[in-house]
Amino acid sequence: MEELIQKARSVKKASIKLQSVSTVQKNEALLQIGAALKRKEDAILKANKMDVKEARDKGIRDSLIDRLALNQKRIDDMIQSCHRVAGLKDPVGEVIASWVQSDGLRISKVRVPIGAIGIIYESRPNVTVEASILALKTGNSILLRGGSDAFHSNMAIVKAIKEGLSRSSLPVESIEIVESTDRKLVEQMLKLREYLSLIVPRGSNRLIQYVVENSSIPVLETGVGNCHIFVDDSADLEKALEIVDNAKTQRPGTCNAVETLLVHQSIAAAFLPMMADRLSKKGVEIRGCSQTQKFIKVKPATDSDWETEFLDLILAVRVVNSLDEAIAHIQKYSSGHSEAILTENYFNAKKFVENIDAAAVYVNASTRFTDGGQFGFGGEIGISTQRLHARGPVGLEGLTTYKYVILGDYNVRR
């Protein structure tokens, strides 16, 4: 507990210094971090192999090991992220709006850092880099608490980040990591309101709900991805098949992978067999409703399947009679992450977009695009499914708040 408090104090102190650093200083730090990751890549990969071995020994399924595993390309992606974020416009100091009152006061709404941020996350060591560089670019410090399954990887990555910071003008304490895997520290971290201004949980629904229910610090809720695709009766079936394949099989362990496929009854006989043939060859287990089972031989879907984020090569399939029925199903089971319609009908697309409440609503595109990098944000600290203060992929702007700056001429209120 003492170590946790000390590190929280350190990031709080660093956040005060970061408020006034220049964009040039921040960008230089990001480039130094990228260079340090390159120098330390062998050590990072070696540490990651330890984590992957431990995960396999525990019987963790392959789709989750994929989230944990690093390789040369993923290290290179981390390094490129440092360069990419350094090249993005710095939102801090941006004048969002300004006006002059009748009494002569000049009021400006100015974007500023949030302060010291805590992030609690599971499995994915690339989050360590992504969260750190986005925080630094926006003038925030960050206290990291990664999952025990990625412990060795995270420690090696943070060591590299701190080496990069030591060669910059930013405080080395801008990035700290909780070095204990004791789960009790998570509960204690959620009470450090004196030091942390925001908590960001990334991981399972169980983790996210625990943080939301137990934190005394404001939470940026990154949600579960129970994502749907509806294949409308006017859809181009060949193109629709490509999208369903991509959304399910490219990286099934991610939160933007599709979990439930809804198919209009008028094209079910044509689409379902071709879909089942293609996906089964890639190892996908299909669970279908009673109508689906009339067209293809699949495992029966249960009620719980409609509300499950599988994070695996499993797809729940339901045949619906209309667009309205598809919308009603999504409204009932959606986690508010990413939802898609595949259609050639403009009015159906418009109705779907207007009636689906999610962070990202797609027309004729894969749900896999819900990602800060794919949206042009340079990365993300998480994908928010809440409405305040940020929604969808949370990039640089989502890690800022604002203050009002008022310029007067010795004005007094009358």
Swiss-Prot record:
Keyword Amino-acid biosynthesis: yes
Subcellular location, record wording: Cytoplasm
Keywords: Amino-acid biosynthesis, Cytoplasm, NADP, Oxidoreductase, Proline biosynthesis
Known EC number: 1.2.1.41
One GO location term (cellular component): cytoplasm
Family: Belongs to the gamma-glutamyl phosphate reductase family.
Reaction equation(s) it catalyzes: L-glutamate 5-semialdehyde + phosphate + NADP(+) = L-glutamyl 5-phosphate + NADPH + H(+)
One GO BP annotation of this record: L-proline biosynthetic process
Pathway recorded for this protein: Amino-acid biosynthesis; L-proline biosynthesis; L-glutamate 5-semialdehyde from L-glutamate: step 2/2
Short name of one Pfam family: Aldedh
Molecular function via GO: glutamate-5-semialdehyde dehydrogenase activity; NADP binding
Entry keyword annotation includes Cytoplasm: yes
Gene3D superfamilies attached to this UniProt entry: Aldehyde Dehydrogenase, Chain A, domain 1, Aldehyde Dehydrogenase, Chain A, domain 2
Superkingdom of origin organism: Bacteria
InterPro entries in the cross-refs: Ald_DH/histidinol_DH, Ald_DH_C, Ald_DH_N, Aldehyde_DH_dom, G-glutamylP_reductase_CS, Glu-5-SA_DH, GPR_dom
Function per UniProt: Catalyzes the NADPH-dependent reduction of L-glutamate 5-phosphate into L-glutamate 5-semialdehyde and phosphate. The product spontaneously undergoes cyclization to form 1-pyrroline-5-carboxylate.
Protein name as it appears in the record: Gamma-glutamyl phosphate reductase
Main location: cytoplasm
